[in-house]
């Protein structure tokens, strides 16, 4: 787990705020109004307006712990009532309570969710009105993780309607309730994981006494709770009489924190890059910009990647004649980590090597000069310049590079290696890596889509982003077809065609995915697999990364958004088209998607389509020079 421990709170009255905090809870949920308000509202004539709160109707007053208080909207409100008067009165009260919560300085207010799908749009409009009536207040819609009906996704569908009607408002969040007897399918658990869960709410009755009388969660609830802890939500307990039945109030706090501490460690990439979760970054353009020292430093922290490279070079050396001298060139050497790998591999393989390092970044080249003097005893031949214009009077046996982007080719590795392969020995020369494949899968991520929208840039949805994805869910069925390959590149390129304007590196792919449960398409995630040498590989593709290169963190996936979220019904199909295009001076990617409902007779009905994104590279392209 990451270092953030869960924040635990409990529902209480205004008079017991201090006691609850003293018992170990870090925040409290407090009703904003009392029964008196309900009685007055019920007594109002249809033509009367609700005036300001009366003294006996206010259940909370600002005090020193206001920063530890979450407001609870009145439980009796019926924003989705079929009775227009009741719905209107409920909205009046909500607006009053929201205004009062803002006045008190509260950061958030919890609303009970809609009671059924029938009038959810009425509920959504009222919430939208409340959101727009305040400046900073967060609105947390409390919804059970499952509906309890035949359609497990009913509650999630209601939330999606509310969220969409409110325009993905940044202050609209979920307070997800985990009922005592809930048993949602894993698809639903994962779907909620992608949503903006600000808080987990649980009844104290969800706990059962262990043999020592202390409150614990059952196995299923414990597993769900453990998963959602990765989102760092606050935990709110309610049912104030339950502590008398199972232990004391502090026992809940102790147990919940014990659950956190007993979780298995988070993947290394999450531990090292926690601050990068769901943070959109534009991919590097190493051909047109010189990387900074900190960028090299971050790349060099990945022991897995360099261990794989070293093993690949070692294996390649072992396959060569023991008495020969092998000429190895590291192109794009940066600060020299691959040079270190090659020199170590030469020692462990007992092979003699002639080592060359080429780098075009003058700042990094100065580091290579220093390292050659201090670390390599002058054994490395250093070359300054662009690898594509390098013309040595000798041939290279092993050409080593680390030019891969998050989808393999997206940082122009093909263009670079095509441009330098003329230095390879035509008979025995090899490249490390020797090939790489790009993969893609459809994802649902309100968080990532909102991050792109919040850039307030008209081109934001037509760019690719590098991102450590956390708040997302896969839309494709969990089978062998969840991740589809788009295209591959092989080096050296054996095609004897004369390369003109880089046209041989154009690509097009069209792939389909099956959606087994309802969701919202917010874009596509891109990955790669690379073969370094023979069976030695690198992968950031989720289906193979654990087997090929576990705990590698040099690359985050690519996120390709779509301009407008697309609803994807259960058992529908998503079709994805992608182009890799070039004009000889730059390379860019274009993409679009279609959704289909496939009927039993094999025919299909188109549900929706997107436009082609980044047409002609208008929003983003990679410069070749």
Swiss-Prot record:
It comes from the Eukaryota. GO terms for cellular component: Cdc42 GTPase complex; cell cortex; cell septum; cell tip; cytosol; lateral cortical node; nucleus. It comes from Schizosaccharomyces pombe (strain 972 / ATCC 24843). Gene3D superfamilies: Divalent-metal-dependent TIM barrel enzymes, Hnrnp arginine n-methyltransferase1, Vaccinia Virus protein VP39. Pfam families: PRMT5, PRMT5_C, PRMT5_TIM. The keyword DNA damage does not apply. This is Protein arginine N-methyltransferase skb1. Coiled coil: none annotated. Disruption phenotype: Leads to a redistribution of the Orb6 away from the cell tips. Residues 280-588 form the SAM-dependent MTase PRMT-type domain. The lineage of its organism: Eukaryota, Fungi, Dikarya, Ascomycota, Taphrinomycotina. Interacts with the N-terminal regulatory domain of shk1. Shk1, cdc42 and skb1 are able to form a ternary complex in vivo. Interacts with orb6. Interacts with Cdr1 and the Cdr1 inhibitory target Wee1. Signal peptide: none annotated.
């Amino acid at each position: 787990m990451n270092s953030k421990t869960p924040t635990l709170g409990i529902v209480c009255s205004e008079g017991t705020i201090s006691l609850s905090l003293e018992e170990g809870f870090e925040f409290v949920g407090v009703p904003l109004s009392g029964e008196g308000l309900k009685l007055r509202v019920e007594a109002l004539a249809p033509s009367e307006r609700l005036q300001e709160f009366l003294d006996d109707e206010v259940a909370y007053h600002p005090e020193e712990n206001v920063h530890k208080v979450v407001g609870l909207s009145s439980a009796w409100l019926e924003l989705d009532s079929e009775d227009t008067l009741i719905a209107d009165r409920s909205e009046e009260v909500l607006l009053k309570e929201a205004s009062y919560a803002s006045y008190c300085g509260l950061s958030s207010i919890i609303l009970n969710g809609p009671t059924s799908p029938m009038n959810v749009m009425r509920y959504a409009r009222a919430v939208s009105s409340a959101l727009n009536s305040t400046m900073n207040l967060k609105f947390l819609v409390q919804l059970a993780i499952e509906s309890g009906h035949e359609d497990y996704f009913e509650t999630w569908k209601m939330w999606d309607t509310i969220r969409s009607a409110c325009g993905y408002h940044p202050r609209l969040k979920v307070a997800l309730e985990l009922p005592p007897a809930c048993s949602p399918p894993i698809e639903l658990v994962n779907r909620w994981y992608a949503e903006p869960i600000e808080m987990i709410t649980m009844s104290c009755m969800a706990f059962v006494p262990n043999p020592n009388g202390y409150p614990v969660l059952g196995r299923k609830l414990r597993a769900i709770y453990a998963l959602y802890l990765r989102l760092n939500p606050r935990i709110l307990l309610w049912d104030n009489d339950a502590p008398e039945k199972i232990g004391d109030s502090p026992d809940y706090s102790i147990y919940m924190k014990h659950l956190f501490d007993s979780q298995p460690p988070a993947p290394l990439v999450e531990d090292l890059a926690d601050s990068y979760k769901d943070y959109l970054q534009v991919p590097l353009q190493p051909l047109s910009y010189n990387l900074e020292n900190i960028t090299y430093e971050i790349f060099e922290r990945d022991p897995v990647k360099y261990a794989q490279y070293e093993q690949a070079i070692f294996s390649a050396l072992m396959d060569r004649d023991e008495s020969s001298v092998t000429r190895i060139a590291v192109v794009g050497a940066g600060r020299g980590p691959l040079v270190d790998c090659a020199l170590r591999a030469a020692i462990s393989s007992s092979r003699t090597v002639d080592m060359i390092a080429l780098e075009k970044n003058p700042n990094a080249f100065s580091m290579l000069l220093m390292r050659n003097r201090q670390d390599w005893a002058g054994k490395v031949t250093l070359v300054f310049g662009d690898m594509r214009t390098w013309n040595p009077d000798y041939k290279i046996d092993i050409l080593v590079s680390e030019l891969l982007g998050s989808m393999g080719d997206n940082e122009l590795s093909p263009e670079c290696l095509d441009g330098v392969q003329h230095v390879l020995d035509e008979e025995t020369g090899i490249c490390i890596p020797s090939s790489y494949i790009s993969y893609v899968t459809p994802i649902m991520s309100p968080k990532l889509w909102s991050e792109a929208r919040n850039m307030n840039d008209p081109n934001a949805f037509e760019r690719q982003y590098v991102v450590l994805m956390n708040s997302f869910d896969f839309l494709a069925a969990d089978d062998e077809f969840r991740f589809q390959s788009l295209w591959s590149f092989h080096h050296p390129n054996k095609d004897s065609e004369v390369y003109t304007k880089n046209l041989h590196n154009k690509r097009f792919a069209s792939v389909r995915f099956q959606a087994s449960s309802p969701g919202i398409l917010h874009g596509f995630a891109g990955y790669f697999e690379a073969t370094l040498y023979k069976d030695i590989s690198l992968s950031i593709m989720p289906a193979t990364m654990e087997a090929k290169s576990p705990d590698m963190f040099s690359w985050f996936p690519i996120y390709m958004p779509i301009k407008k979220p697309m609803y994807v019904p259960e058992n529908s199909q998503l079709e994805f088209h992608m182009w890799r295009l070039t004009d000889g001076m730059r390379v860019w990617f274009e993409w679009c998607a279609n959704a289909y409902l496939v009927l039993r007779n094999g025919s299909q009905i188109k549900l929706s389509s997107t436009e082609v994104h980044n047409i002609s590279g208008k929003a983003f392209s990679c410069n070749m020079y």
